[in-house]
């Protein structure tokens, strides 16, 4: 294990291109340990989720097939999708204006989830869109975190701050619209686990590697966000600690969004359609 840690640490050192003095806030050994164990943890979570889902699907084969949920076409869905698409495009322009390194920030969850929600809001492939939504609904926690503690220090270009808030409020609204007007899913633990497993691997594998290559702090994988009075969170364990906190919170908040969206659907849409 010690040799493996050394090899991974040296690999990170060889591909890294620092542009900030905090680039090595965590040691190469710390990065290597977390790269191995956190990715293993999230792979196990995905494996459990997939197997639970297979078991659930097998059990459902024996039951009568439910009547498919009705999709209520909504102009609001299209408006929110267009807003998200425009925001992603504007963010890409902003990043390109700052140089090739900054373009890697397009991997940030807000931009990826914006693209996913655009697809879910507009796709004609209802069944696949439903599965994608079952996974992506739990990422609303990232949106909430960004709105509660917005990091606007680097947003200096015209309209960039406004664009940030417009995008994130659209991201906040989108899951409720998708639940109320389109998919009306239920909380399913297998999909919740797959969701969090993918989220974790995107950080501790994909973001980790691209952070070293570009030198940019994608979703704070190199060094912590400005935490103010909570400076004790900036110790070496901040990534692991926040990862597990988000893991638990995402399941609870995702479930709450499902319940609220279903309530909106049953209270307003179904009653209005029955009149």
UniProtKB/Swiss-Prot annotation:
It is found in: Membrane. Belongs to the TMEM164 family. The gene is tmem164. It comes from Dictyostelium discoideum (Social amoeba). Disulfide bonds: none annotated. The chain crosses the membrane at residues 32-52, 74-94, 102-122, 135-155, 157-177, 193-213, 240-260. It holds the Pfam family TMEM164. This is Transmembrane protein 164 homolog. The keyword Protein transport does not apply. One of its GO terms (cellular component) is membrane. It comes from the Eukaryota. InterPro entries: TMEM164 (IPR026508). Keywords: Membrane, Transmembrane, Transmembrane helix. Its main location: membrane. It is a multi-pass membrane protein. One of its GO terms (biological process) is positive regulation of ferroptosis. The keyword Transmembrane helix applies.
